[in-house]
Amino acid sequence: MVLTPVSPVVLVILDGWGYREELVGNAIAAAHTPVMDSLWQAYPHTLVYTSGKAVGLPKGQMGNSEVGHLNLGAGRIVPQELVRISDAAEDGSLAANPALVQVYEGVKQRGTKLHLVGLCSDGGVHSHLDHLLALLDMAKSLGVTQVCVHAITDGRDTLPTEGKTFIQRLQDHLDRLEMGQIVTLSGRYYAMDRDRRWDRVERAYRVMTSDENIVDTPAWKILANGYAENITDEFLPPVRIAPGAIAAGDGVVFFNFRPDRARQLTQAFVDPNFKGFERSLISPLDFVTFTQYDASLSCAIAFPPQNLSNILGEVIAAKGLKQLRVAETEKYAHVTYFFNGGIEDPLPGEDRILVPSPMVATYDQAPAMSAAQVTQEVIAAVEKGVYSMVVVNYANPDMVGHTGQMKATIQALEAVDRCVGQLLQSVLQMGGTLLITADHGNAECMVDEQGNPWTAHTTNPVPFILVEGEGVKIPGHGTDVALRDDGCLADIAPTILEILRLPQPAEMTGRSLIQPLEVDLRPNRTPVRVRL
């Protein structure tokens, strides 16, 4: 019979809570966070890397929530889709991709239009401009002449007004190829909603599927006009600037590689049972997505999912132990789908709690978001005493940090700090262990070198704090522990397994962050009282 460990391990992911020593523009340094400050002083802590090759991204590439949670749950460095697709573009195999070739040849034979849809930036979080340029090169080489680009502008994973640079680079490439045109523009606020705010998605969809209300203005000028009215890239209202509506018989390639913000717009095009808003299904329509956005969607996939076996959740489930995932809407997919390596359905013994995010235009209007409700759900679950592992995400540092609003971000951080304090008391009373970390940086850098708002992620490391409960929580140590200072997110799953006394599978190549000190064994510390 498998015995459930006496007390839980609770992994707290402070989304976007990075570490940076510089004080200028550092919302975390400016915020009053007595709980996190006390824990950092009182308990074993270290910094872990969350960007670049440490998480399977190109060198110097900032991390993101999808990548972070994927590495956290997999317990290994997972080669990311950005690298996978970029390699295909560089070595020429992209042009031979069966799913892409089929849609390209199809529109060529039918004499219909090819539509390239996606986020037009080099942010590398949801897409990369180089991938779009490679798709255009492929169209040129295959003799596809009717090419319509539906450019989604960023301003969130890039600077707020950097879109003009990306659009100009795209237009220059089209001019060199003497083929294709930009036909629509839409800020990601509309085209890439992930919180079922269908009114936003509908505005992008209507513009993409209708040749009415054409604004005869170059794309760069549309953006410049928006900047003059304080409308940044993210919030650019959808607009059609040239003919080329998506119609029956056409082919579509959605070149975003991250699923969560591409899913809803894709559903509007391909789901025969779509209920988000009134529309007639465009059929037939050859629709290809770069990666699998949702297993239930009937569309071709250029880069099918990679198989990850023996991830952390599977190891827990295989031992007959119960686990829980809790997050509000904005990060729910991350603690479930991404943390489970792309598995949509819950694992055996895995429970999930979704707390609705507040329905506001931008989260600086509600910086506390739903953190208090998330905390209460976790406390209630921990006190049941049935879960061996609990994974909880606090979205505030990232989601409010993305607004670029310093005051609101400070308020968000302080709200999360209070919640961590409340959760801490509950976990320690149960004799549990609290592991506090983040998936990437954001809130620690709110301005760029010129003092302008910085709304993107960072390449900074993030904190990792190990908070012990009343009992002997680190098996085999019975004393203070030291933590390695060269770790990455992939090392956290092995750390959890060590605490739970579970063997680490061979596929999990990360290394536990725990290393015992060379001292005589003594009883565990009395937990330090945290200033609340």
Curated annotation (Swiss-Prot):
Belongs to the BPG-independent phosphoglycerate mutase family. It catalyses: (2R)-2-phosphoglycerate = (2R)-3-phosphoglycerate. Mn(2+) 2 binds at D15, S65, D439, H440. Monomer. SUPFAM superfamilies: 2,3-Bisphosphoglycerate-independent phosphoglycerate mutase, substrate-binding domain, Alkaline phosphatase-like. Its cofactor is Mn(2+). Catalyzes the interconversion of 2-phosphoglycerate and 3-phosphoglycerate. Binds 2 manganese ions per subunit. GO terms for biological process: glucose catabolic process; glycolytic process. This is 2,3-bisphosphoglycerate-independent phosphoglycerate mutase. GO terms for cellular component: cytosol. Pfam families: iPGM_N, Metalloenzyme. The gene is gpmI. InterPro entries: Alkaline_phosphatase_core_sf, BPG-indep_PGM_N, Metalloenzyme, PGAM_B_sf, Pgm_bpd_ind. It comes from Cyanothece sp. (strain PCC 7425 / ATCC 29141). Mn(2+) 1 binds at D398, H402, H457. The active site is at S65 (phosphoserine intermediate). Substrate binds at H126, R156, D157, R188, R194, R258, P259, D260, R261, K331. Pathway: Carbohydrate degradation; glycolysis; pyruvate from D-glyceraldehyde 3-phosphate: step 3/5. GO terms for molecular function: manganese ion binding; phosphoglycerate mutase activity.
